[in-house]
Amino acid sequence: MLCGRPRSSSDNRNFLRERAGLSSAAVQTRIGNSAASRRSPAARPPVPAPPALPRGRPGTEGSTSLSAPAVLVVAVAVVVVVVSAVAWAMANYIHVPPGSPEVPKLNVTVQDQEEHRCREGALSLLQHLRPHWDPQEVTLQLFTDGITNKLIGCYVGNTMEDVVLVRIYGNKTELLVDRDEEVKSFRVLQAHGCAPQLYCTFNNGLCYEFIQGEALDPKHVCNPAIFRLIARQLAKIHAIHAHNGWIPKSNLWLKMGKYFSLIPTGFADEDINKRFLSDIPSSQILQEEMTWMKEILSNLGSPVVLCHNDLLCKNIIYNEKQGDVQFIDYEYSGYNYLAYDIGNHFNEFAGVSDVDYSLYPDRELQSQWLRAYLEAYKEFKGFGTEVTEKEVEILFIQVNQFALASHFFWGLWALIQAKYSTIEFDFLGYAIVRFNQYFKMKPEVTALKVPE
């Protein structure tokens, strides 16, 4: 039985006053020993029912016949509803380019609870993907950074020149991630040279190519030589045309609403529940903040593009020899506001395990980053490369205000993970940190005004 209780209105007011009084000092919290790659587009919005049918003409109560005008009105209403639903679906549909290779689906389930069962499942996949490999010589390496899924590297020999990555989906992550959309995004990005090869999917995961290089951490993303590569690669993804002629629409608010509907109301463990009730905003406050964000941020004028949506440091692979970067993990990719993707990346300068928001990029670094991004984005879109100070200023304001939505989104995500995930990580603590930072930075960034 859950120990949760609803907060009173006075509790809510006290909570907001407390948040408004947070210190501007760096927030630095030890979360856990795990780090990095985490985090389904929301369900389609419900199709509204057509208008109630008139119950007959005056003086003919109980009759079910309709006049010709009434029939016409009903027919038009139904057509409008259907057309609206189709338009919404197409505006969120990720179009895989013709000629893209199909991805095989293997009827294999990889058990990850016991090491020998995990190896059996991985070897079953390798029989299809690397039939020339001797099973006795295959080495399995567990990557421990992930806090959504389990990731295993499979290779033979002493060097990791040819590595097959086996990703096993985390418990209940189907609540958070639309796996079909993930595969579409993977294929689109692969077709444009922005993703490794996707070898196959299987019953509870997928296999893909290992990218040679170094997974970055917060100290790397502040390096101008590296962050300019990151800005250019993100601009390349944002410039991809994957909407087949329809004007794309962001699914941010729908996905956020879905996450909100899934957050727990309490925890069975008494100590965890006390922490949850004292440090997490009430559902009423969260609902009010979501309404406010949608009204304000949707009107900032940020373009909707194909976004990565989870560009934390460990999802960026830097190859010093080749002088380039590649992004990995496309679970949360999809159409979103351009400024959200950048703001989310800036939030990730603080890290995941040891969160330190004093590492959030200052205005000077952001200005350099955003200028490099705009130059590359215009180049990829065929608009030239000249960037004005006003363009940089507008994007700066949009990015920092959308950073609020990023904090809120991952706060909701972490609450759901705290309920379901079997990975060793303090998800509740992470949710607390993200919501605290949301309320801390809200007054400062909302005071920024887009120039006329």
From Swiss-Prot:
The protein's role, per its UniProt record: Highly specific for ethanolamine phosphorylation. May be a rate-controlling step in phosphatidylethanolamine biosynthesis.
Disordered, as annotated region: 26-64
Keywords: ATP-binding, Cytoplasm, Kinase, Lipid biosynthesis, Lipid metabolism, Nucleotide-binding, Phospholipid biosynthesis, Phospholipid metabolism, Transferase
Gene3D superfamilies attached to this UniProt entry: 3.90.1200.10, Phosphorylase Kinase, domain 1
Location of the protein in the cell: Cytoplasm
Gene Ontology cellular-component terms listed: cytoplasm; cytosol; membrane
EC number(s) per entry: 2.7.1.82
Tissues expressing the protein: Expressed in kidney, liver, placenta, heart, leukocyte, ovary and testis.
Primary localisation category: cytoplasm
GO MF term (any one): ATP binding
Record has Transferase as a keyword: yes
Protein's UniProt name: Ethanolamine kinase 1
Comp. bias regions, Pro residues: 43-53
